[in-house]
Amino acid sequence: MGIFVLKFGGKTIANVEKMKLAATRVQDCLDSGKQVVVVVSAMGDETDKLIELAATVDGCGYKRELDHLLFTGEVKSAALLTMVLVGMGIKAKSMNFANIGIKTDSEHFNAKVREVDASNIKKLLDEGFVPVIPGYQGMNSDGEVTTLGRGGSDITAVVVASELKAEQCVLFKDVGAIYYDDPKVNENVAKFDQLTYQELYEIVDRGCKVVCRDSIAIAKMNNLVISIANPETFKIGTVIK
């Protein structure tokens, strides 16, 4: 039975209605006979709001404490989406930084993944659950939460998919593909159907923010194929390999 890792970006789960749509995509994969692991970002612009909140107490320089604040956005998303899934009759359990098995260095606010132990994720899959993983976070050697920097939920999805040897790693984004230009500015712009890792590097370096650059390097190292998709249609927009 193949494993699909589905990562939902913040704008694709910005409210409960969008979470219900995300849950139908999970159900679609389960109906096709796949095991599913879900990775979530914080809802909408929650991370920015938390940073702004920290700024009101001049706290942005305290990176350890920022991590303790910011990781809550993804935890909130994971808990709510799990509630939606369970409400639909899907066996699901949310996880957290202490049990997802992502071990990092101690560079708070921009930690690097050092090791992934997916045994707890595999255990839930074997028990018939959909693990719902809060992205963007890991745990250092002192048992403290760390965050992986901007776009870190993409990193979470890619390292988990690589460790599980997933059949698919699908990143659901509000734009649904990689485009030659910003589709929000130019609605007639064409998309890339397929890109190599190197081509995507170059596009990201020119300012594209659809995929986290560090996640591309990890995918390339593990020969992991990444798909960018639209959650409304479940149509794959761009494949990166």
What name fits each language-model region?
Residues 1-220:
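Nucleotide/pyrophosphate-binding catalytic subdomain
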Residues 41-47, 233-240:
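Terminal amphipathic helices with adjacent charged low-complexity linkers/tails
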Residues 218, 222-236:
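Conserved glycine-bearing catalytic or ligand-binding loops at nucleotide- and phosphate-handling centers
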